[in-house]
Amino acid sequence: MANENLIKVKDEIYNCSVCGQCIKGPVDPLRPNPFFGDYLPERVCPMREKHRLITYSGSGMNSIARALLEGRLQVSDELVEAVQECVLCGHCVTNCGEVFNVVEGITEKRMKGHGVDTPEVVRAMKADFVKSGKEPTANVKKVAAAIEKGHNRFARSQSDRMSWVPKDMQIPKKGKLLFYVGCVATYRNSEIAQSFARVLNKAGIDFAILGEDEWCCGGPQLLNAGLVDQFEVQAKHNVEA
């Protein structure tokens, strides 16, 4: 069925009024500006800043989704590439939520105090694109291939999964609590995993790790790119390991 995933988030799509608040968020009156303050840089939509087009924004993504649902827009390679630009940072949700909190009485709580969940809309579009045969961008496919082949995003050996474990610690593979380490903490920022393991150990918590049986969660790289089937394979393995 066309737009199968978009239909599930239809309410989010039609709650977007295309007000543009998602692009830069609220004004900070304490920041210098010749008029009335400046926008918070940590709230700015990164793809909108890059392209300077409304298409590349939260409201733009919702407008695309609405057009797809209503049959006013057809999926093309250019459209897929544009939607893949969204990194799902969530700035738009935060910015939108502040607006609806202010005017909650006017909107009769239609948003229940939160903004339009545009990242969920974008995930749905990406998943529908993949189902229709439109592949993700080359960079996404490269990472997905590395995960499928070696079960981690960095194309590292699974035998290195235990390399972060401090030499003075012995961590079992069975315990009451599972510490899922993840690719980044395993291969790049091992001090994070080491520190957390020491905290658990100091607290006397009976924990375990999957070690070489741990696979990439696939969350950011697969699920956020619409590669739902491959993501589910990774998740199922980790649950059953």
What is each stretch, according to the model?
Residues 18-24, 47, 88, 98, ...:
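Disulfide-rich extracellular modules and peptides
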Residues 1-21, 29-34, 39, 53, ...:
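Ferredoxin-like iron-sulfur electron-transfer modules
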Residues 19-33, 95-104:
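Short regulatory "switch" loops immediately downstream of catalytic or recognition motifs
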Residues 10, 55-241:
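Iron-sulfur-cluster electron-transfer modules
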Residues 42-44, 176-177:
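A common structural microfeature
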